[in-house]
């Protein structure tokens, strides 16, 4: 590291609380903190002072420009950079930045997805400063986290609905806590997203069109060794990878990102970074930044960072575990069971709300993790199934069972494990194991939503989760606020809701085929693909939910459905076209060149009176497979040409049912040819080349 003092390094490029205290007048600082804490509007005078202080600080860090940094419906971040310079009368420039420029920007909104909310010619859009997420300096620019909306006020981004959902759950959770005699002004959800990724050599990446255009390999035969030896997970870091991770930590720490854990993952070349949890909107910004920084740092080390959910067939893909909890402004974690969870009525009530939310809004949670990339993982024995269920562990299960049955609860779970060696002390045994096949698992004092794909913006999953739980808390508060006997009413409510929603709790193996049958018996949803999931965005119960909590309007929900269907279709179209190009321009010419060499060898042997049986046999196999590849590629082109163009939903189902099958048909002979054609002829690096030489 260039700086070894980590506390000094951490947040050094962030306009954080420490900097604000140093650079803002006391009254301005207090007003800004009130805005950040309570979500109140910021007045123009305060904004002007903050803007000047922010500009001066940014210049001291080497910034010459500023940008309103936002997250449109593409799921990635967007930025337009303006310099601080303002011309003076004498032909020079001054460095200026006004309160108005801080609070509001005006990017062109016509080139971002709107899902029908805006016509192409309706270009005006606005960005609005989010003061709850710190500004920072990166690459010579001051980055100001913002929300993004249209000229008519319709939301066009990921951040605004997230902030609204956080307000919704705060409002309803505070109502519940008031019933328990607690004076809480604000409740926030917190998230710690674990980020998986692949690192491959940049030279290999540059030689593969599929990786460049789609982020994943469309062809590739399995090498002799994959991940079956279990020797990569938590294995020793190779020097190049360790150097990358060290550099990554430093860059993330500068930006105030709490990078905590790093290790090798299951697949070759696969790794993970996990941060300490923080407030959800900040965690979302930080995760977007993390993915950007990963790509940048990877280039410096001669790598390319792959964030696609399934870059390589035959080995695990990458996900992103969303560790979610709820905390009060007094620091209390509402999902902390305490020493005696059976006696912690408040915790059990919040747990019940989450169980009810996950059951009633399984469709929204499934939608929030749906994508073309994640379709390769969900239900593929490497990630949770596409069926949403919950795992709460043995102790909590026993507590809920006793509440439902009315039987007395007996605590048998607090034990210690004796490891059988005198030098090793007895260690406390957790009251629950970890079920890695569960999409939504309780892990001690938080829920781990494990179905997210590695490339996804975590905002959507947390919007769904926050809003669904807010609705259940609202219903609970409405019922309990009028209760004459609060304790009896709480107990009756919990008992009723557990009985009604226990179907969502599953403790078994989610990879087992029997779970699909069992889930169907329970009436759980099974959306096998993104194409199946997205249309349920606009189910009436979901429209009602978001309208009730002021998270989305009906038009905004419809726009998100259309945007995601359109994105799904575009991704699969690009993949199909890339596959066709690679067959036509690379694989087929390579096979023909190899055939020509084989034919020359066969003819030379014949002329010399030597039998060329092996060469002739190989020539026949390669020729036959090349013909098959050519025919299947032509069929793929025909399938793509027939995609419906009048309806995104129809097109999505067509891509899933027809085009993907046609792509599989193309890949099969190509992968066989890779194992037959001489290495010097094969036109791009193979899995063996890519996965084992970093």
Q: At which residue positions do the language-model features occur?
A:
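Active-site proximal loops enriched in glycine and acidic residues that flank catalytic Cys/His/Asp
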Residues: 46, 70, 98, 275, ...
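Hydrophobic/aromatic-rich, well-ordered segments within soluble, folded domains that form packed cores
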Residues: 63, 67-71, 284-300, 326, ...
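Short, compositionally biased "basic patch" segments
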Residues: 1-7
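C-terminal amphipathic alpha-helical interaction region
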Residues: 499-694
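Active-site-proximal loop/turn and secondary-structure-junction residues that shape catalytic pockets
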Residues: 46-50, 70-72, 100-101, 148, ...
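Glycine-rich, acidic/polar active-site loops that bind/position phosphate-bearing ligands
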Residues: 123-307, 316-319, 326-562
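Short linear, low-complexity motifs centered on an aromatic residue
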Residues: 75-90, 110, 208, 215-217, ...
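Active-site core of metal-dependent hydrolases
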Residues: 9-122
């Amino acid at each position: 590291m260039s700086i070894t003092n980590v506390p000094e390094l951490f947040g050094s490029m962030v306009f954080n609380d420490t900097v604000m205290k140093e650079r803002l007048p006391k009254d301005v600082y207090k007003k800004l903190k009130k805005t950040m804490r309570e979500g109140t509007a910021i007045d123009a005078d305060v904004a002007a002072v903050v803007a000047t202080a922010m500009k001066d600080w940014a210049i001291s860090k080497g910034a010459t420009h500023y940008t309103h940094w936002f997250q449109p419906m593409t799921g990635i971040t967007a930025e337009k950079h303006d310099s601080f310079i303002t011309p003076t009368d004498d032909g020079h420039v001054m460095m200026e930045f006004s309160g108005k420029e801080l609070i509001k920007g005006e990017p062109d909104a016509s080139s971002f997805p709107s899902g029908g909310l805006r016509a192409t010619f309706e270009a005006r859009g606005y960005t609005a400063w989010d003061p709850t997420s710190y500004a920072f300096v990166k690459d010579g620019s001051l980055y100001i986290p913002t929300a993004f909306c249209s000229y008519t006020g319709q939301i066009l981004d990921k951040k605004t609905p997230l902030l609204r959902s956080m307000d919704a759950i705060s409002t309803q959770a505070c109502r519940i806590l008031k019933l328990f005699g607690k004076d809480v002004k604000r409740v926030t959800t917190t998230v710690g997203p674990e980020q998986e990724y692949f690192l491959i050599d940049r030279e290999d990446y540059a030689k593969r069109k599929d990786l460049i255009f789609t982020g994943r390999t469309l062809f590739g035969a399995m090498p002799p060794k994959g991940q079956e030896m279990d020797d990569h997970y938590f294995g020793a870091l190779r020097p190049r990878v360790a150097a990358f991770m060290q550099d990554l930590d430093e860059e993330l720490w500068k930006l105030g990102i709490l990078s905590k854990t790093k290790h090798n993952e299951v697949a070759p070349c696969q790794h993970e970074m996990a941060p300490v949890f923080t407030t959800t909107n900040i965690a979302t910004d930080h995760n977007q930044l993390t993915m950007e920084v990963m790509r940048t740092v990877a280039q410096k080390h001669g790598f390319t960072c792959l964030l696609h959910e399934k870059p390589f067939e035959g080995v695990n893909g990458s996900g992103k575990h969303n560790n979610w909890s709820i905390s009060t402004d007094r620091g209390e974690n509402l999902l902390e069971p305490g020493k005696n969870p059976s006696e912690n009525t408040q915790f059990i009530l919040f747990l019940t709300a989450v169980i009810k939310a996950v059951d009633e809004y399984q469709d929204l949670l499934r939608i929030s993790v749906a994508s073309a990339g994640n379709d390769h993982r969900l239900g593929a024995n490497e990630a949770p199934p596409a069926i949403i269920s919950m795992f709460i562990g043995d102790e909590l299960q026993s507590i809920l069972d006793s509440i439902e049955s009315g039987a007395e609860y007996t605590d048998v779970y607090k034990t210690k494990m004796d490891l059988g060696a005198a030098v090793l002390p007895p260690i406390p045994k957790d009251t629950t194991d970890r079920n890695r096949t569960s999409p939504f698992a309780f892990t001690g004092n938080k829920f781990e939503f494990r179905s997210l794909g590695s490339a996804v913006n975590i905002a959507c999953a947390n919007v769904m989760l926050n809003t669904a739980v807010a609705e259940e808390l609202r219903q609970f508060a409405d019922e309990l606020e009028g209760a004459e006997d609060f304790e009896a009413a709480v107990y009756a409510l919990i008992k009723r809701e557990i009985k009604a929603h226990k179907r969502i709790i599953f403790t078994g193996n989610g990879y087992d085929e029997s779970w699909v049958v069992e889930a169907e018996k329970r009436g759980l949803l099974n959306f096998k693909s993104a194409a199946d999931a997205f249309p349920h965005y606009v189910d009436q119960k979901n429209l009602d939910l978001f309208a009730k909590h002021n998270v989305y309007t009906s038009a905004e929900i419809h726009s998100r459905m259309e945007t995601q269907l359109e994105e799904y279709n575009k991704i699969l179209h690009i993949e199909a076209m890339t596959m066709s190009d690679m067959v036509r321009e690379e694989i087929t010419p390579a096979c023909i060149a190899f055939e020509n060499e084989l034919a020359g060898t066969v003819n030379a042997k014949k002329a010399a009176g030597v039998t060329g049986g092996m060469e002739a046999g190989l020539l026949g196999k390669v020729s036959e497979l090349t013909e098959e590849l050519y025919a299947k590629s032509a069929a793929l082109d025909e399938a793509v040409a027939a995609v419906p163009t009048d309806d995104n939903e129809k097109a999505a189902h067509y891509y899933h049912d027809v085009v993907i099958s046609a792509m599989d048909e193309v890949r099969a002979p190509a992968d066989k040819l890779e194992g037959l054609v001489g290495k010097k002829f094969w036109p791009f690096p193979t899995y063996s080349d890519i996965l084992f030489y970093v």
